[in-house]
Amino acid sequence: MALCHRSRPPDDGAGWVRRLVTARCRRVDGVRCTRTPRGRSEGGRWSRRDIHTRHTEKKHRHVFADGPAVVDGDRTRTWAQLYGRCAQLGDALRKQGCGRGDVVQCMLDNTAEMVEAQQGVAMSGATLGSVNTRLDAATVAYVVEHSDARLFIADERYEATCREALATLQNPPPLVVVGGQDDGYEALVESGDAAAPWTPPEDEWDALALNYTSGTTGRPKGVVVHHRGAYVQALSNAIDFGGLPADGGTRYLWTLPMFHCACPCAKEIAATAC
């Protein structure tokens, strides 16, 4: 189970994710602390190093550079290639104005692009939202509007549903389609620079992913997963699995739709080889 913060949004709904992400007050061991970036208290009474899954990405880029990272049909991407494309996507999103406190919603199947989004959105500093691909247009519209999405990335299979949903919104985010004749997603990635500098999250409690419940007892509710929670769960998986051989020979067959677990999943599986 992911370690996550559940927050009841205010009645207006707009911008609640941004307010949650940028909140500077947290409870640590039952004591309310006002923290500066990098996790030091204002009074200097406690200090620690922020932890996040960016460490594992850099490690795999160097140690398993030529090893396969993602196999999607007849497409195979090495760890070096995956890292490069994620860095490009992160830079491209920053150029689009996406950053800390913003949400990038995705409606994608289990594809290489979904894996790239899981990493690339985080590298831009933004928060990834993964929309259930089985939702109807009305519910998609609610999730996109409620999360105050800055950008919406969707597979061409769901383009019609997404356009129908966005047409009902007053201020819809731009839609980037994966596949099709134009393939706006590829154009977006190519607009980014893989060598552009990027920094880890300002705070380990910053939002990494925003997952929405199915809404069985009402409207879907947003559940925030922070960087620290994803990292700790990655270590938990490593312990549960007993560690994986570091020879790059292990393969994980992904059958669960990625939108169910969103961001942390890929990082948790990858981190077990650390």
Go through each PLM region and give its residues.
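A short N-terminal helical cap/helix-turn-helix that marks the beginning
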Residues: W46-A69
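Adenylate-forming
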Residues: H60, V70, L82, C86-L89, ...
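ANL superfamily adenylate-forming
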Residues: A160-E204
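Conserved ATP-dependent adenylate/AMP-binding module captured primarily in the ANL superfamily
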Residues: L135-A165, Q233-L253
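Short beta-strand->loop structural element characteristic of the AMP-binding/adenylate-forming
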Residues: Q105-M107, M114, Q118, A122-I153, ...
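Conserved AMP-binding/adenylate-forming core of the ANL superfamily
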Residues: P68-T111, V115-Q119, D136-A141
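Conserved short alpha-helical elements in the N-terminal third of ANL/AMP-binding
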Residues: G120-S124, R251, A262-C274
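Conserved adenylate-forming
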Residues: L93-C98, A195-D206, L210-W254, A266
